[in-house]
Amino acid sequence: MNRHFLILFSFLLLSVPTFAESALPVVEIKADRTMIYPQRMELTGEETLMDVLQMVPELMIAGYEDVIDNYNLRIDNCPMNGDTRLILSQMKAKDIAKIQVCDNTGVAKGTIGMGRVLDINMKMPERLNGFVEGQGDFGKEVAGIGAVNALYGSKATDLYANASYRHQNGNEEYLTLHMTNRFDERNKLLTYFTQQYLDHPAGTSRKVMGRARYFHTFNDQGTELLIVGGYQYASDPALSNKLPLYIVELNTPLLTKQLSMMLGVEGDFQMTKQKDTDRSWDVFNNDIYLQFTYALPQWKLTVGNRVMFYNYKLMDAGISQKHADTRDNANACVIYVPDSRNQIQLGYYRKYYNPSYQPLFMNAITLSDEEWAITKGQLVERTINQMKLAYAYSKQRLTVQTEASYYAIEDGENFTELGASVYWKTMVSTNRPTGLTLAGGSNLYTAKSGTYASFRFAPTAYLPHEWQIGMQVVYYTRNSPRRETTGVPVYGCLSVNKQFGKKWNLGVDWHDMFDAIRSEAKVNRHAANIRLQYRF
């Protein structure tokens, strides 16, 4: 009797973390971003970053090589100048602590216009692991791809390294190194280095970037200071530029535990030179930003503002032109959380379009309405006012998200954007899990000039003997920019994977498959991608 009681009691103790983990939401809405926690999902271990991103309502798949064309990919808020398609398909969800889908981070991150950020925070293993992978893409054009990836974690040091090479009408080389050093419980240093080299028939370009992020925690209440320093050099056949930057940011509770404040200053100094004319220009940006969040058990209120000071100078034939402008981003948001499953958001966001410096200083012919900036001789902003309503329901095996936004654009066309997504998984929990994942979503864009939509469906089956079969299908209605660009109304990709023991994985993707059967396709991109991966 006592023995049975002890066994039952031990089982309950071991089960508590599992119950607590499954009770936490997979998706968490914040004022300026949506957080996804893969570790709270039921994972087989083979899910990729791209699989998890299927639950994002505003995800726009533009093709096999451009699945997140409207996002800037970062790791720990450092831009990742790598082969995006490889990173999305190779990075495993089990190695990710959280995904930050940042659609309105104009205050916190200084994004401009409709710019969005996809920020990944890694979950490091307690030992060294990684893989070496080779790929061949066989279609109208043949491509060879090689990649190596390594993760290492310990009590004091974490290391992430990724390198890839692609040969297809030229050569592309990428290298990313990211290291975290924890000196003690209150001091941490993140260092980051990335390099890319692109050798194409049109010319050669390269980019090198280094960044250091130092965190110091002052007290047990969580008052934290962040200091960032970085430098970037980029060069292509037309231009070369240097970009040093700095950030100083303080995050702290204020007066009560419910009220928190983010206060920061940020600056960068871009120095650009036009090679054929020897014309050069300097752009100095200095920002001040402040954001308050008041959190109650079921309510969160956030207000914030970032003021940007622009100083830019053109130097040409001994003549110097100087200009100065001020911009600001703002947000105001309320989030209601009635229980651990449901979340509702209502927010207002003020952002702006800033015409690029290139047409302003180079007198370049552009494909957008930024041409008008040339005649004015200075940057003139266009304000964007966005109202957003969002809802999320999430638990371990099911997430549902909906979003509705209205954009009022100064001197532009106002439009409405609607998005919805569903992610559902049913698994048989064994040593070799089998089951099914169903993911889908839709996006609708409507304005006076027209309306278009996209619908996507992405099922994945986990079969016995470690087989995995997945499919991505996206349908684009008339007037969709994607459909008008390619001439094809449907994008499709069929994937088959087979795991051989713990070390080897063989996969085949038949991508852009509908290009082969649609006569209106402007470019036939359908191909078979074959890859072999060795894990260590």
Please provide the spans of the model-predicted regions.
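Outer-membrane beta-barrel signature, preferentially recognizing the C-terminal barrel domain
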Residues: 207, 322-323, 340-342, 352-406, ...
